[in-house]
Amino acid sequence: MSISLKINIVGANTVKTLRFAPDMCIQECCTHIFEKTNEGGPDHGLYQAHIEGKQSARWLAMEKTLQFYDINSDQQLDYKKKHRPQKFKLLDGTIKTQLVDESQNVSEIVNSICKKMGIKNPEEYSLMNSAGAWLNNTQILSEQGISENDITVLMKKFFFNDANIDRNDPVQLHLLFVQCRDGIIEGKYPTQREESLALSALQCQVQLGDYNPTKHVPGFLTLKDYLPLQWLKSKGVEKDIFKEHKKLVSMTEVNAKYRYVQLCRSLKTYGMTSFDVKIREYGKKKMVDHILGITREQMLLMLTETKEVIMTHPLKHIKRWAATDKSFTLDFGDHETEYLILQTPNPEQISQLIGGYIEIIMKARKDSSKVIEKEDTAMGVEEVMAVKKGSVANSSSYMGYGAGGGGANQLQPSQQIPITDLKSALRATDLLIGELGGFRSSTGATPQNFTRSFTTLTPQQFKHQLISHTNAMAIAAQGLFQDMTTPPPTGGIAAFQQAITKRAQIIMAELNTVGTAAKNAGYFPDMASFSDEIIGVATKLSESMARLLAIGSTIQGTDCDEKSQKAAQTEIFNVQSLVTLMMAACDNEYVTDSSSKLLIECAKNVSAAIADMLVVGNSKVEFIDDELLLGQIQNTLKSTSLTSDELLSTTENLASTSCHPESRKQITNITQSALNQSNALLTAFKSGEIPEQDYNLLNARVSDIIESVNLINYAMDCSEREYKISITSNGVEVGEGEILAGTNLTEEFATVANDLTNAIMTMRSNLKNPDTVMESYKMVAGHANRLITCTKAVASRADTQSQQRLFNSTNAVFESVANLSNHCRSYIKNPEQEAHTFQIVETAGHLQFLTQNMSTDAGKIACITSLRDYSKEMIAQVSSLISTSRTSSQYLPDANGITLLKGAKDVSDALSKLMVGIKKVVLDPKSEATQMELLTLAQKQSLPPMNLVSTCKRFAPKISDPNQKQRLIFSSDAAAQSVQKLMKAGEAYKRICGHIEIEEALEVFDSTIADLETTEIAIAGGFLDAVSGTTREGAAELLMVAIKDLNKVNNELVTDIRVNPARLGDLVKSATESASSVAISAKTLICATTGKQVQKKLMGITKQLMIDMEQLIRASRSVASNPNDAASELLLDAASNDVSISTAALVGSTANVDCKELDEASADISNLLSLKMGSLESILSQPTEEFAFYVEEIASSTKALNAASQQVVAMARNKNLKGLGASAKITASALSTLVSHAQNAIVLTENEATKNAILASTVALGGQIIGLLDFSKARIANY
């Protein structure tokens, strides 16, 4: 079924009639129009003009369908550009032209204008039309009759944050000055004569400059441009103005504007918006004229004639208010005994102003995370009500929230529509969707009417009630579906309509309650940061209800056709999953975008596998002869199809919250249900004894489903929770920009760091020109803010320790930028002082150091994050390719189809392995081992997907169906691109984290060790060739030089890697080169040394040194990847100690130190440990005393060994060779005694753990003594 629409192509000034499917989205419609007419382009959209009494003007959203907007045949839509130039004027007369998006509402356009002008707090500004009326912030320009040629005025509507505007914000200061000046002159802010004189003098200083006695004399000023009307004829007023002006000599224009604004702020009526109202006073029939004034703090009521203030109330005293066509009613609760009813032609404007001020107040409290005190809770129940015939209307909806003093609740437009049938319910739902959209902070809109409910409920109770009402709405929706599909047995159409109308009323009552609750969520400090998500879920529920009601409204009579039933059932599935989504939203548990997309693609894969199975199943039904079994199979086929739809709908809704237990449970249950039904279908066909070949085909399809379900389970295991990160410094949010979707943070860090370095260099070069310093500073600050924004994005994915480290870094950068700002301003004021120049240079250098460190640290985390994300993207795209391949195999010759299916199966196994690697990194994100394992898996498991891509592209031309061929080619290209992205991410990870240098280093060490082992074989065989022309003394000297160089490089590596991880690659490269030099020198020495035993000893020590260096390199990578991690640093220290011991042993064996006793002691200890303490089984001691005796002897021997070791150290330091030999023999003897007692203790104890502990401790102590002797020999050799 299609509909015919008249499309007015505005650019070509023609109208064409085209046909569209009702379920086409607006984007598809625009593409269709472009293809048919060759008019327009990406900037064009569809616009529905205003229809009096039926439809307000609106732009149709690209993602919505024609059916959603209830577009019927023969209606006309405009096809035109969304953007147009629009002129707006400032109060100083300046006219600016800006390109605006017509589809945006006024609030969004004002946001855009303010952003370009550098105006903060855009929510306080709005546009005024030529008649002096404020435009409605929630409506588009064309809806309010603003054409391209009209000029609107940008003005400050709300005076709330203007106290924060100072001399450093010249744009806003100028706009505020002009608006204050006009307000004073027009009499909006009544002033005394002295106040008017002071303000006029400041205005003279701004506009005329310093006082000039020859020029500035009475008669010079046009007084009506400086004074309000009431003081124009005051005696000597111009002379008094110049008298005050004379006092302001040398005051700058900016300071004069600032003083002017400050003085205006001190006025009681400052920022007051006035409305002419009438009040019927007690005992009088005639209405009395008054002025109602509203400021950021209070409401004032004044007599029109005398301007006497007869009533004031802080805004927080207003319990509720209501606007009708010609009146406005205020309820002050306990502060007044009666309602204040005002007759006014502008009730809606008053309502908007009060609502706007309170919204800004509550937003400011929410943003600063302040807890609302008890005395402020009155503002929490301020509400707007619909009032008819002067009475305050009570709303029956949502009375449980904000019940402070029994106040009534706001009746939004969506709540004012009486629900008499499904179409009225549908209109109310559409209005509710618009209202919810206005409440989302991301839109920047300022909704007209807020329902504010700071309630006595705790956040947990609030969440519980919100979820309860959501559940109730879902139950009501299920009831509506049953009524639609199962009409009442009696009563006919009337009973049917009555039943579904009653259901619609229940649905709308609950839906409005949910919508109201969602709006109030933002005013709970604990929920403010994720209130948009809650509103988003409420919006989705409303949209789903709208679609369900639309389906119901199309039912003719009492019969719901199969297509409508299926569409309605889909919405019921949708609503059920959205109930769970609301639970997750209230708990603020969301996963990363890559995790969500992966899960959705896996669900699509399952759904496609089920669809393939259903195709086969439906084609084999004809083989079933048993009618009972046939009915069972047909029912199972139908229920499996529904479950597949439910799975896809549920996963698409809940994928973003798959870390929440309820979301995961629901997805798992539906997935398992689909699997069970598939197996049941297979069993039923088997009972029907269908041909074996057909059964095998069906079995293969069920196997595909099982594989796809496994991928869903893996995908949920890989889900990563994402956190919203807020970093503040001195109460100021740091890094307020946004990261665009799809931004490669790894590349972004490199780019921003480079831009920041260039900006700092530019600033340094501009120090000779004070006029350009601030511009240079702004560039530096902009790049620093961008870097902080990127860091926040990375921190949202990091572990707690890394987050804290990044927070500290961003705060340090922010404070450094602030210091740089202060120094720049001081320099501009006094450019001659060299101290300011020095401070700028010093602070800029410090900032550069901080940003480089932060960029390196966050960049590494971004690398592993990108590796995970691109792994998931690859899995998602390849999963889609698997699904497409399975379907495509049916269109290929048998042999080719089998090959394609086999390739798909191989890929499923590869994806499962890769997801296991992702899961490990998610569970332990700091582990270098799991990161390297994921990197290896990503490289290895990318081969099967690429093979499948190659197979698909090879077989694609053979596919008979052209559409399927195109799908396979498209899916293959997407999969190939995702694999390429993953490979690039892997290379970036290795490059940025220093892993390329480390991998090269490890390869060098493997090669060196292999070469040493070859030399070891040559030594054992006796065919090691000496190097001609090389003496042992010369080789030993070269080795000592190489060892000293290695020692220096290793010290630098161990020290610098802790404070500057960015140097990992350079440090590792230097250490590898030095170690290679040591190995080459040691090999030369071995060739120049005679005697196999000596050669073997040197070779063994050199080989051990290379192994220890390899471990040192690995440990340094761990420290660089996990800064300030105690475990990694402990590993580095241990590896460094092992290298030192091996180096000392090599020096001791190399040096020509004639100390026979020392060598003998070292050999004796080695033999002792290997023979007597090699293992528990080798201990054959026969103790003669008790276990306790030997424990005491071990302690005594340990003390003796310690004393002997200290003597060895003393002799080595004094280079007393003779004393060193004697001390070494004593130490060996003490160790021998200790070993003997340890053996006896091991034999006596029956505890295996104690045995192993004594053995390990003794062997370790012996190893340390050997190392000590080697160090001593190295000391004697001047090492």
From Swiss-Prot:
It is found in: Cytoplasm, Cytoskeleton; Cytoplasm, Cell cortex. This is Talin-A. GO terms for biological process: actomyosin contractile ring contraction; cell morphogenesis; cell-cell adhesion; cell-substrate adhesion; cleavage furrow ingression; mitotic cytokinesis; phagocytosis; sorocarp development. The keyword Plastid does not apply. InterPro entries: Band_41_domain, FERM/acyl-CoA-bd_prot_sf, FERM_2, FERM_central, FERM_CS, FERM_domain, FERM_f0, IRS_PTB. Actin-binding protein that may be involved in the control of cell motility and chemotaxis. GO terms for cellular component: cell cortex; cell trailing edge; cleavage furrow; cytoskeleton; filopodium tip; membrane; pseudopodium. Residues 84-365 form the FERM domain. Keywords: Actin-binding, Cytoplasm, Cytoskeleton. Its main location: cytoplasm. It holds the Pfam family IRS. GO terms for molecular function: actin binding; phosphatidylinositol-3,4,5-trisphosphate binding; phosphatidylinositol-4,5-bisphosphate binding.
